[in-house]
A protein has these predicted regions:
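Active-site neighborhood of HAD-like aspartate-dependent phosphohydrolases
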Residues: 87-88, 98-140, 144
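Substrate-recognition element of Asp-dependent hydrolases with the DxDx(T/V) motif
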Residues: 96, 126, 135-182, 231
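Surface-exposed patches in mature extracellular/periplasmic domains of secreted proteins
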Residues: 55-67, 75, 149-154, 190-196, ...
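Structural recognition of the beta-strand scaffold that forms the well-ordered cores
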Residues: 89-93, 99-101, 148-153, 194-198, ...
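Non-catalytic pre-domain segments flanking phosphatase-related domains
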Residues: 17-92, 276-288
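C-terminal cap/substrate-recognition subdomain and adjoining C-terminal extension
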Residues: 45, 162-288
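Soluble non-cytosolic domains of exported or imported proteins
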Residues: 34-45, 111, 125-133, 158, ...
Length: 288
């Protein structure tokens, strides 16, 4: 009888509680921890300290594919690239790189929801994301150094069935939303040499992989620096790789990290999560 009562007590206790949302700890870390703020500031401070040096290295690119097109390696001097006279540029991701969308995740947690394309698009239309710590100062410095700023995001172009006052029906309302959000967050306006490139803006840009978009940029610009919160922001054909393949890739390109590639921390979502496949996530836990 005592055992039965204990089981009933446990059942009643558990039924009165709600399971913690998968993103709770990660979102709280982003929104409240000084460590998140410090890490983001550190990444952008290091990147900022490299701006003038990389701007003047006319024969060096951060992009693996651009280097290959000249028969060279990323981060190494390439005479053919130097002779091409391309515009020096930094390529930055947007979400969780320059704009912090943790408020969107916090709302999902409060409402017991999960990420959905429609709710995400509503958030994009709201234009309410705030700057990631350090991002604003970095972009301002890049522009002051005469470096083109290219935003390359996986925000997807899609026609909204019903337009609204802020985003009337158009082929890619998400682009205007993003431009306006950047402006309201304090980022400098784009000038003709700068670019904002969305996923699906052209038919050949419909993949979450950014390779074709970086190739487009590389025709006119020397990609001197890559900044993002996902490994796919730095290199091509890596988003679907396994945990082990991704680790080997990082080890093989260690020299680029902190010199030409700048990786922000994002514990909330990303291709690191989709790499946990083929077995339960808990089986990836290391116990020794």
């Amino acid at each position: 009888m005592k055992t039965v009562l204990m089981l009933l007590t446990c059942f009643v206790f558990m039924s009165g509680c709600h399971a913690q949302h998968d993103s709770m700890d990660a979102t709280l870390w982003v929104q409240t921890s000084a460590e998140y703020q410090g890490n983001s500031e550190m990444v952008f401070n290091v990147a900022e300290s490299r701006l003038s040096l990389l701007r003047d290295k006319q024969g060096v690119t951060a992009d693996i594919d651009q280097a290959k097109s000249f028969g060279c390696l990323a981060g190494m001097s390439c005479p053919g690239l130097a002779a091409a006279g391309l515009i020096p540029a930094v390529v930055l991701d947007i979400d969780e790189t320059v704009l912090d969308n943790s408020a969107f995740l916090a709302r999902l947690i409060k409402n017991g929801g999960q990420w959905q394309p429609d709710s995400w698009d509503d958030w994009v239309a709201e234009r309410a994301a705030v700057p990631v710590p350090g991002a604003l100062a970095f972009v301002e410095r890049a522009k002051a150094e005469g470096v083109a700023v290219i935003y390359m995001t996986n925000r997807r172009c899609s026609v909204r069935e019903a337009g609204n006052e802020l985003s009337p029906k158009q082929p890619c309302p998400q682009k205007l939303d993003t431009l306006e959000n950047l402006a309201s967050a304090g980022f400098p306006p784009l000038v003709p040499v700068d670019l904002l490139i969305l996923r699906g803006e052209r038919p050949e840009w419909d993949s979450a992989e950014k390779q074709t978009r970086r190739q487009y940029v590389a025709e006119r610009y020397r990609i001197m620096m890559l900044i993002g919160d996902d490994l796919g922001d730095l290199a091509s054909n890596i988003k679907k790789s396994s945990v082990e393949e991704r680790a080997r890739f990082v080890s093989a390109h260690e020299f680029l990290l902190g010199n030409y590639w700048f990786q922000l921390t994002n514990p909330t979502y990303g291709s690191w999560k989709s790499a946990l496949k083929g077995k339960p996530a808990q089986d990836y836990l290391r116990l020794d």
